Amino acid sequence: MHLVSKRDDEVTQAIDQCVATGYEAVILSFGSHLNMEDTSTQNSTRWKKLADYAHQKNILLGGYSLFSSRRISDEDDVIDAATGKPGGAFFGNAPCFGSKWGLAYRDKIKQFFAATGFDIWENDGPYPGDRCASRQHPGHSNWDDSQWKQMEIQKELYRWLNERGVYINAPDWYFLDGTHKIAIGYREVNFSLSREQQMILNRQNIHDGTIEKTPSMGWGFVPLTQYQGGGPEAVLEPLREHLPAYRQLMMQYYGAGVQACYRGPRLYDADTTRQMVAAVIAWYKKYRSILNADLLQLRRADGRDWDGWMHVDPSLPWKGFIMLFNPTDTAITRTIRLPLYYTGKKTTAIIKKEQGKAMSYRLARDYTIPFTFTLPAGGYSWYTVE
């Protein structure tokens, strides 16, 4: 859960809602009242108390902090070699990690995690690769070594966090430096679209974002409340009034093995909402091993016909897990050649629709089977391969 909070009691409420639904972590999202750069004893004590409360409930607690894409000062920002002045960064203005402010930022993050016991760091705007022409910054000599030195500063920070078991979310490809999860497809304006459009877009992002990554290497986004723009048709609040859309957005991401940012003040607003969320989480946890397995893209979503994917792992009891969607306004029946090579099945396979009746299939020489499915208008379904 990505919590938008203004008060400490909202954090404890979110932790309690996670316990009630089966969620395992809360991240204080951007726009919340968490400030990791505040090194006061009062701030550390406050957040340690909340982290301790979360840990007593077996919930992980994390928080958001922005490094890049903001202006600090003429002395600490990246200096453009062409002008000798701040500016010219990838995002216009950005701090230099080798500046006094940048080195202090690194130390403040370390101090916060050491003092509070937080489990997750959402490092938005990690170092984007800006070079800096300053000759006064203590962390680098000049333009020539600025990129290398800044990357080393960030890498050392990530290594320090990893040594302490801290999980790192960041939007850039820094896996070899210590990041654990990056965006699977993220454009802020897209989350002002209608819920129906977001469903299709999310499945397109899942398709594209799992070609070079395993599902758990990417995170998606579900705006429970307004984000950037968009009207009531773009958000899920009040949650109890949009249960089918809320459920499908969860099923799509969890069915892909992708953890999304469910961003808002709460996970449920009524007992019916709580029951739905808890049921989806229980479903995900039952099939978690196969849902985190490698994913084969069957057909990319385009809103015109069926789309879907299949997880595969021959070492598991469930060798495959299929998710299929029908975005059209009419029921459809399709027959496709389902590729089962990577399930490890060689002669026959058993497929069950939502753990219902078992159907036996004989594999062709190319390890495919003719698979016929029917989906209702705007519907979806899932199947296991055994």
Where is each model-derived feature located?
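The substrate-binding groove and active-site-proximal loops of carbohydrate-active enzymes
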Residues: 1-8, 29-44, 87-106, 138-150, ...
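Alpha-helix-loop-beta-strand connector modules within alpha/beta enzyme cores
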Residues: 47-59, 146-166
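Short acidic catalytic loops
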Residues: 24-33, 105, 109-140, 169
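Conserved structural scaffold segments of CAZyme catalytic domains across common CAZy folds
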Residues: 1-77, 260-305, 313-320, 327-334, ...
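Non-catalytic positions within long, well-ordered alpha-helices that form the structural scaffold/packing
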Residues: 19, 113-114, 254
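C-terminal beta-strand-rich structural cap/linker in extracellular carbohydrate-active enzymes
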Residues: 362-386
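Active-site-adjacent "subsite" loops/lids of carbohydrate-active enzymes
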Residues: 7, 45-52, 56, 60-118, ...
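Active-site-proximal substrate-binding groove within the catalytic cores of carbohydrate-active enzymes
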Residues: 153-358, 372-374
